[in-house]
């Protein structure tokens, strides 16, 4: 049997650990679904009260909504569960083929081929990690795939309906202005996710009054986290991520990894975080200077092949 301490309560689960994991997963999904449904209801009530509370013609209805709001027994998620509570907007539909690369070659100063005659096919739903030593061309390849670098030889054929979202540390430079963090992210979030913005910001280490900081006063690392969250709220179906776990703590990395595993699109990423790579990858592309090898399995499979 298994005993779990969760949210301050100790609960007993009969059976072995495998049985416990299955039962607990169902319980957590049920709790999260109920929480999300209630948060949506609360948001609708609060929105009506905010918009019509001061209009004489709607005052009675607003008061009735306030009574409904006051009667709600709120579902509380334990802090440990909130840390893993994040969902993407639905990914736009695209075909099975996401990208095909034919003979991609990239050199600097016309002397050295960092990437040489690279061929690659990426299909919908795959999560490709690009690995290799520093200087092997990992970030260069991601810039090419994202369209940021067009100075290369070869051909990139995107699939039907593919919409690319690209993240690198340079994205932080776009986060500026006198808007608060909360207002900025709410302006980027789809309507159905606005009630969950505070939870999302908390998952990315913006908690309490931090959400009222203006963008201009944020550090580079904080701006990078905001840029990443903004991208994750965008309607894309191919995410190209260069070191997305930089500036995240352990729990936030878990948030990101679990969200990406549930993402309805395709992911190409570079990371130095071994746990993140092992937990997320379904396919590996190894780059060495001027060479490449593709492995049709996760990172553990790649390690076994070495």
Residue ranges of model-derived segments:
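Post-kinase regulatory C-tail/linker adjacent to protein kinase catalytic domains
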Residues: 86-88
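ABC ATP-binding cassette signature C-motif
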Residues: 1-35, 82, 91-306
């Amino acid at each position: 049997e298994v005993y779990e301490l969760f949210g301050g309560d100790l609960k007993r689960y009969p059976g072995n650990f495998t049985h416990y994991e299955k039962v607990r997963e169902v319980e957590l999904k049920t709790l999260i679904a109920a929480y999300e449904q209630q948060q949506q209801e609360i948001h609708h009530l609060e929105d009506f009260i905010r918009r019509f509370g001061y209009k004489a013609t709607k005052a009675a209805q607003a008061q009735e909504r306030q009574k409904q709001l006051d009667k709600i027994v709120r579902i509380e998620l334990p802090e440990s569960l909130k840390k893993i509570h994040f969902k993407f907007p639905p990914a736009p539909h695209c075909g099975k083929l996401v990208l095909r690369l034919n003979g991609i070659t990239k050199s600097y100063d016309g002397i050295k081929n960092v990437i040489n005659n690279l061929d690659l096919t990426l299909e919908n739903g795959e999560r490709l990690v690009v690995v290799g030593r520093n200087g092997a061309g990992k970030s260069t390849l991601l810039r090419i795939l994202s369209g940021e670098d067009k100075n290369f030889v070869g051909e990139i054929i995107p699939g039907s309906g593919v919409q690319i979202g690209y993240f690198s540390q340079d994205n932080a430079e776009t986060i500026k202005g006198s808007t608060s963090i909360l207002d900025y992210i709410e302006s980027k979030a789809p309507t159905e996710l606005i009630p969950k913005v505070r939870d999302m910001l908390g998952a990315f280490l913006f908690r309490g009054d931090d959400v009222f900081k203006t963008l201009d006063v944020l550090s580079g690392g904080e701006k990078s986290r905001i840029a990443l969250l903004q991208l994750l709220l965008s309607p894309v179906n191919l995410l190209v991520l260069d070191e997305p776990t930089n500036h995240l703590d352990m729990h936030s990395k878990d948030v990101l990894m679990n969200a990406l595993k549930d993402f309805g699109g395709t992911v190409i990423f570079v990371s130095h975080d071994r746990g993140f790579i092992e937990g997320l990858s379904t396919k590996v592309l190894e780059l060495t200077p001027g060479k490449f090898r593709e492995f049709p399995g996760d990172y553990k499979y790649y390690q076994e092949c070495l």
